[in-house]
Structure formats: structure tokens, C-alpha cells
Amino acid sequence: MIVVFLHGWGVRNPDYGALPEWLRERMGASVVDVWLSDYITYSDSVTMGDLVDAFERARQQNFPGVKFACVTHSTGGPLARQWLATYGVAAAEGLLTHLVMLAPPNHGSALAQLGKGRLSRMSLWFDHREPGEQILDWLELGSFESWRLNQGSLYQPLPFLFSLIGSGIDAKLYDHLNSYTGERGSDGVVRAAAANMNYNWIELKQAGPQLNVTGKQRSAASAFGILPGLSHCGPTMGILSSISLQNASHHLAAQWVERCLGVTTLEAYAQVSGELAATLEKAPDQGSMIVVRVKDGAGRPVKDFDVYLTGGPGYDPGQLPKNFFIDRQRNQITPNALTYYVDHRVFQQTRELGLRVGARPEAGPVNYLAAEFRSQEATVAAVLRAQETVMVDITLERRLDQAIFQLRRAA
């Protein structure tokens, strides 16, 4: 088995811990052929597409036509998934047999919006080096590129897919000026809900003052686990970099990676998935992400809008449970995307969930009418789940005033 390791973003000297060496010793050098990647993410000129093309070129040069597995950390996860989506022939041939993602920002990271300059000042993560801006843009919550990849993945055949993330916060990496580094339901960089590849997509289209459900899709079930005591990175608690030859035999991440790579049948995959699912209830926090994208009937982004979550019998923002709200972030590059992050345990106190959308201008030659979506209890339970993301695609009616264009009979 060829195992390719893909590191994360903003890395100049990849640190895979002792996991590659330990796997080779554990599974046998004749069984495991380990390849370590080293790719550039700190240049502003490099895009995710560039990395995908370069990965494919390296694969063709080194082991063309040979099946392989991937173990990724952080941004390496979306990179491997983008490779799958881009090089469909390879995906159809089943060349990628296993994808084991550690702390993957599949739905983005709230930290990305801070900008490369501020992130570079977090010396323990980036050693005072600025991460590449275009990769950073990809990672921002609700980005066009991540949305496209996740929507496409709803219909894409996948290999044996595993997502693992820690629930620990390393105090040494906490930034007192930025609460995201200690955010509930995260590993200090990525939210569990953003790492999870079990998610929902729902489409709402406006009809007068109402938003009606016109489409919905759930992702194929995939293995997801939350590992206590592990954070995104760091030599002490990092989900990957804290693995040593001395602790690998009892290190949670090392143990699970070995088990995931050993899966060869659907029955074994279901067994591992079930055991990982049991870790979710033990997680100290349970957050949910709601990523909203607003556009008009022609597909053009609506950039000036407000989205309110509503609850209670009256579908009012004031009737939502207290302390349900954790964070709200609008994408700076794709301003028609907005992400809510809520405490799912608190949110479960309401049986009703709604969305109220108001876009501007509200009057004038071209305007928008405010619209509202009201769900039922069963819909809330099915769509908004703990430690998951729901993608909400909203299409508003673009209203044209009669005065914008008129015809009159000539005298």
C-alpha cells in the first residue's frame, strides 16, 4: 500500500511527527510505501487549483496508475478532495482507496478571515511567516471554492473516507486577542462541524414573502470522530505533530489512522464508523454551522442583505433560546455568504427554526421583498445536526419597478 502524507497550509517545514515511520514499522516496510509531500502554500500566487495540478503531476511522475491512500493534516484534506473532484478519471478508477483527514477545514476556518498579516504574528503556528493569500481565501468560511467543492461532493463517489479532529485547546497556542483560538467545539483552528463530511444542503426559493424548500440533499454517510486531548497542532497536543515513536502505541490519532488504513470492506468501514460515532457524544461541546448563500434568480450574488435566525412559536429572533449564539461571520471575498455558528445543545430547546432574509435596496427601480422560511420540528432535527454543517442556498426574486422600462403607442 502506498501512503501519501499531505501537510497543511502555511507550512515551510512539514512536521508529520513519527506517524509515517511508526506506520511503516507497524504494518511492515513491504506493505507500506510512505511518500511525504512538501508543497508551497505561503506564496500569494499559489491557488488550490495549482496545488491540485502539481499533486497530479507528482503522482504521475512517481507512481502512475497505482492505487494509494492519503493521510492529510489540515488543508491537506481539502487538497486531496479537490484532487478527487478535478481528476475524475483517477477517481473513477478508484486509485485513491483511503482518505484519512486529520483536522481538515472542509467547510473552512473562522481564523482565515483574520488575514495573513495577523496570522503570521501567531508565531507558534506560522513562525512569523505570512501564509499565502489565495489559499487563505479558499479557507474562509463560505468561500465560493469550498462551497463548490462541498456541493459537488454530495454526488461524487468517494473512497473510504475518514475525518478525525481533536477537542482540546492547547493553552500555549491560545491568542488572548483572538477568541477563535479557544472557541468551543473546535481544536483551536478548525471547528468539528467544519471538519465533518456528514452535512446537508438545502435550497430555498422566494415566492412573495415566503421562502419555499425546492431542493435538499444529504451527503453520503462517512466516518467522523472527535478525539479528546488533541489540538490542531503543536508538539504537546497536536493531532499529528505530537505523535512520537514512544507514544504512538497509545496515541489516539496514531491508533485510529492505523485502523482506518486497515479497512478493506464496507462491513469493516461501517464498524469503524460506528465506533468513531460513539466519540461524538463524549465531546465537551456540540456546535452546528449554518452557511447561507444568497443570490438572485439569475444566479448573481446578492451582497447587501441581513439574515436572521428565528425560533419559538412566533418565529421571532427574540424567541430563540438564550446563549445559543456562538459566532456570526460574513465572507469578505464572497460577501453573499454568511456563516452562523450555534450551540446545538442549547438550540435543541426550540422546536421551530426559521430564517428571515432582508435584502437591499428595499425600494427603487430594482428592489427586493423581505422573505421568511418557517420549518417544522422534523425538518430541524433532520437538517440541523450536532457537529455538522448545513449549507443553505437562498434565491431571492429581483423585483423591477414598472417605471424601469415602458412602451407607449406613438401619437
Predicted region positions:
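Serine-dependent carboxylesterase/thioesterase catalytic core
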Residues: 3-9, 48-151, 296-303, 307, ...
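Short Pro-Gly-centered beta-turn/loop motif in secreted/extracellular proteins
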Residues: 329-367
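Extracellular beta-sheet/turn segments enriched in Thr/Pro/Gly and aliphatic residues
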Residues: 266-283, 356-411
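Short amphipathic beta-strand segments in non-cytosolic proteins
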Residues: 306-329
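Short, surface-exposed "cap/lid" segments of acyl-processing enzymes
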Residues: 1-33
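Short beta->alpha junction loops
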Residues: 36-47
